[in-house]
Amino acid sequence: MNSTPDTSSRPSIRALTLLEGRVLGVLVEKQHTVPDSYPLSLNALTLGCNQKTGRAPVMNATEAEVLTAVDGLKRLSLVMEGSSSRVPRFEHNMNRVLGLPSQSAALLTTLLLRGPQTAAELRLNSARLHGFADISSVEAFLDELAANDPPRVVKLARTPGERENRWTHLLCGEVSASELAQPGAEDDAVPLSAFEAVKAEQKRLADEVSRLQTVVRRMAAELGIDAGDLTAGEGA
């Protein structure tokens, strides 16, 4: 595969359905992880769509529903059906249609399969598709995907308690303006809500320690054991 990013303008395609996005992501993933079984049969493709691990959300699609999604992707030239087997087998054509290098395809596939993620999460979760040297290289390809015409990914605003922005793909449609990261926002700033979340967690842990100490004293009393040594440090 060509690994040189292609930032040229590409024809727009309609927004994919959630299941179409899942089918496309599964085909790209399995090409790398189970090459001996690729292209995939309808049964294998359905199992990949309904996989419990590495998927968000988890689905329970039928073969008929997956086949409908495949037909939709075939009309967009994103999926092709092989003709060399008695059992229909399907393969993706995403890289060529969208003009993606292998690095960008790995990131987009991981977003299709697992939903919004930070650059660090994407580096970890896409490792079997492409090994990124560091988070900076992940961010560089994300920025290029976001700069494509049309854009393929977008950076999301941080939610309360998050320290890093997450990214999401746009193949299934746009996201609302309230979800987008604001230009000029300080990347290293920690929102006040994050500190409040830490305070709440500290209080929860303190309450839990107090509860456990009470349980220890009660059990010690029932067993006739002096619990003084066990709780001596509770006021430290």
Swiss-Prot record:
Gene3D superfamilies linked to this entry: Winged helix-like DNA-binding domain superfamily/Winged helix DNA-binding domain (1.10.10.10)
InterPro entries the UniProt entry points to: DUF480, WH-like_DNA-bd_sf, WH_DNA-bd_sf
Source organism, top-level taxon: Bacteria
Family statement drawn from the similarity comment of this UniProt entry: Belongs to the UPF0502 family.
Protein name as annotated: UPF0502 protein Bxeno_B1639
